[in-house]
UniProtKB/Swiss-Prot annotation:
Entry annotated with the keyword Transmembrane: yes
Spans through the membrane: 4-24, 25-45
CC annotations in GO: plasma membrane
Compartments in which it is found: Cell membrane
Protein name per its UniProtKB record: Uncharacterized membrane protein YyzN
Keywords: Cell membrane, Membrane, Transmembrane, Transmembrane helix
Gene behind the chain: yyzN
Organism (species): Bacillus subtilis (strain 168)
Bilayer topology term: Multi-pass membrane protein
Top-rank lineage group of the source organism: Bacteria
Length: 52
């Protein structure tokens, strides 16, 4: 399940970052970016725990 979800979230996050760059928005000041990074980290940790 995580083999599909994590790459999909990473692709959406990369497109979101590119959109922010093209619209000249601040990447660092946007709290949604930190939320997405937290979700990716949480899913990655959960995936590693399930493999063990």
């Amino acid at each position: 399940m995580y083999k599909i979800i994590i790459p999909a979230i990473l692709a959406i996050f990369a497109l979101w970052i590119l959109l922010q760059i093209s619209l000249e928005m601040s990447i660092v000041k946007n709290p949604m970016n930190y939320f997405i990074v937290f979700i990716i980290f949480f899913l990655f940790v959960k995936m590693v725990k399930e493999k063990q």
